[in-house]
Amino acid sequence: MAEAEGESLESWLNKATNPSNRQEDWEYIIGFCDQINKELEGPQIAVRLLAHKIQSPQEWEAVQALTVLEACMKNCGRRLHNEVGKFRFLNELIKVVSPKYLGDRVSEKVKAKVIELLFSWTLALPEEAKIKDAYHMLKRQGIVQSDPPIPMDRTLIPSPPPRPKNPVFDDEEKSKLLAKLLRSKNPDDLQEANQLIKSMVKEDEARIQKVTKRLHTLEEVNNNVKLLHEMLLHYSQEFSSEADKELMKELFDRCENKRRTLFKLASETEDNDNSLGDILQASDNLSRVINSYKTIIEGQIINGEVTTSTVPDSEGNSHCGNQGALIDLAELDTPSSSSPVLAPAPAPPTSGIPILPPPPQTSGPPRSRSSSQAEAPSGPDSTNNALSLLDEELLCLGLSDPAPTAPKESAGNSPWHLFQNEPSSDLDFFSPRLVSAASCPSEGSLLPPPVSTSSLSQAPLPAAFPAPVVPASAVTHSTGSFTFSSGPAPALVPKAEPEGPEYPSSSISHRLDALDQLLEEAKVTSGLVKPVSCFSPGPTASPLLPASTPARPLLPFSTGPGSPLFQSPAFQSQGSPQKGPELSLASVHVPLESIKPSSALPVTAYDKNGFRILFHFAKECPPGRPDVLVVVVSMLNTAPLPVKSIVLQAAVPKSMKVKLQPPSGTELSPFSPIQPPAAITQVMLLANPMKEKVRLRYKLTFALGEQLSTELGEVDQFPPVEQWGNL
């Protein structure tokens, strides 16, 4: 066999399909399959090479190419299945059997083999719908008269799904202990093993009961939400009967009661549990339909326009139709370069409770996220703030983390320039944070009328139950224009010094974390938090108080025995772990041209529909920061459609920090077979001073052609922490 070193896919295929071969050479066929699995773009290159060989005028070469294709489908996995399942490759196969193209010049043996492969794939790969469409089209055109027989030895058997793991019986420590006890000849050990088995069975029964209860709760919530949503769609104040109104009130009460149940379920669910997404989606739908009921039936304007309506719900959400609190992930939503940068004004001395921004508000009726962009006018304040209620749930549960952006080296009016010198890299991960803006039409506002700013853009998640559109007459519009930002959080109480503005110290951040937890407790117990004033934090430090405004509390709390203000300081301190200066990445910036690649293999973070994201690891750490891993994020497009509006956000646990530097672009051109794939690069910095195992979550938003997509994922295949700086 030829040496594998230096062999390319083309050389492997040329040897495997050589017309001079007397028989199929499986040595080279398997070598070709292995090379596909090794190469980053192996499947994309392989299908192009195979399509050319299959259309060869030499029958023996074409038959060998089809044998290679069949072997690849069995050995190269889903990546190759996705490429073969695209019309680009299927059209090449159809040309072989269609009399309009090559059908009259291709032998019957080759055509029969192609039809046989297509039919076997329709049975073995039902998820590849395009293969089935192509085969049925051939049948409709009469090219395929009947389904060919498929020998058992040539049937494509997909890889079986992984065996579902039982967390109780797959516990490594218990399994080792049980095996040790069972091997023992001591009767006491056998008795202990018997007790251990019984306890494991009980744990498994409790787990099954918990899962059953969760499924029942989710089903009940979804049924109530669906029924209430449909009744609200057909509600008319003049023509709806009292019975309908009573039924809607009963459904509304049920939905309110289920909020806390869902919040409890989410808090009890592990981060890596697949059911967490279903719980959050159900909570998202529940919050949306509750807000719709309050708006349509009770006439409330949600989130800030009527002060009695701005109390956050029991889950800590502040919903607002097509606007909401951004998920506290990588802060990559860039403000318009025309946004003014306001200098902090002198503020009165701070009190024991730091000032927190109230929930955001909307200047129009609540609407579903799926329709907000289509219905809203093109102005920046109405289209760019279509944010996700699911993001709010992630934010409140502490499952999402911020990753601040780095300043660009070039100055000017670039949107990234506004992120320079921000203190947000010291903010806490996984702690509930209200990164939002709001306004109040009342005279007690702490800010003068805000200057008109350009809002930030965030791709919305589709709404499962879009909220009904409320007539404009039922809405009292706000007078201000506000900006939401997933960018750096502003200084809450800036101090006045001769040298210039100064951002709050870490102790204030700790008190913020403690108050965040108090707010969460207050929302769950009795909904005591009622903002009486509103202000708008922007992406840069903005004045929160005019110089002449006296200090006064923003958040009145009830003083009953259950009030969170009576909780012990020890409880309050649990809001956030102590953060040291070594976590900060604000001053760390790594130019792309200075990065040296390492020998570590890249990790595929996302690969779907021809859009792929890879993590490449740098050889060295930034100077003076051996705890920081430098990752180059490569985004590739092999799809025939352009990919636009690409935004990548990242999150890590509290003991780490992550920062995404500005990407080289936000659009990828369509794939062309005569040109290399379009690519975007973005540098990501990951600080891990505690040397813990890295678990990074990401949120990816993009538009493939005209279709908007939002993807969530997790990556944990990082190099060992001990090898950072010497990869």
Swiss-Prot record:
Swiss-Prot/TrEMBL keywords: Endosome, Golgi apparatus, Membrane, Phosphoprotein, Protein transport, Transport, Ubl conjugation
Provide one Gene Ontology biological process annotation: Golgi to plasma membrane protein transport
Where do the record's region annotations for Unstructured hinge lie?
A: 299-597
> Listed GO cellular component terms?
early endosome; early endosome membrane; lysosome; protein-containing complex; recycling endosome; recycling endosome membrane; trans-Golgi network
The record's note on its domains: The VHS domain functions as a recognition module for sorting signals composed of an acidic cluster followed by two leucines (DXXLL motif).
SMART domains named in the record: Alpha_adaptinC2, VHS
Q: Where is the composition biased (Pro residues)?
A: 343-363
List localization entries.
Answer: Golgi apparatus, trans-Golgi network membrane; Endosome membrane; Early endosome membrane; Recycling endosome membrane
Task: Give residue numbers for the modification (Phosphoserine).
Answer: 159, 275
Q: What does this protein do?
A: Plays a role in protein sorting and trafficking between the trans-Golgi network (TGN) and endosomes. Mediates the ARF-dependent recruitment of clathrin to the TGN and binds ubiquitinated proteins and membrane cargo molecules with a cytosolic acidic cluster-dileucine (DXXLL) motif. Mediates export of the GPCR receptor ADRA2B to the cell surface. Involved in BACE1 transport and sorting as well as regulation of BACE1 protein levels. Regulates retrograde transport of BACE1 from endosomes to the trans-Golgi network via interaction through the VHS motif and dependent of BACE1 phosphorylation.
Q: Does the keyword Membrane apply?
A: yes
What PANTHER family does this protein map onto?
ADP-RIBOSYLATION FACTOR-BINDING PROTEIN GGA3, GOLGI-LOCALIZED, GAMMA-ADAPTIN EAR CONTAINING, ARF BINDING PROTEIN
GO molecular function of the protein, one example? protein transporter activity
Q: Where is the composition biased (Low complexity)?
A: 364-374
Q: What is this protein called?
A: ADP-ribosylation factor-binding protein GGA3
Q: Where is this region: Disordered?
A: 334-385, 400-419
Modifications made to the protein after synthesis: Phosphorylated by CK2 and dephosphorylated by PP2A. Phosphorylation of GGA3 allows the internal DXXLL motif to bind the VHS domain and to inhibit the recognition of cargo signals. Ubiquitinated.
The GAT domain, residue ranges: 171-298
Taxonomic superkingdom = Eukaryota
Stated membrane topology is: Peripheral membrane protein
Q: Where is the VHS domain?
A: 16-146
Name the Pfam families on file: Alpha_adaptinC2, GAT, GGA_N-GAT, VHS
The record describes its quaternary structure and partners as: Monomer. Interacts with GGA1 and GGA2. Binds to clathrin and activated ARFs, such as ARF1, ARF5 and ARF6. Binds RABEP1 and RABGEF1. Interacts with the membrane proteins M6PR/CD-MPR and IGF2R/CI-MPR and the accessory proteins SYNRG, EPN4, NECAP1, NECAP2 and AFTPH/aftiphilin. Interacts with TSG101 and UBC. Interacts with ADRA2B. Interacts with NTRK1; the interaction is independent of NTRK1 activation and ubiquitination. Interacts (via VHS domain) with BACE1 (via DXXLL motif).
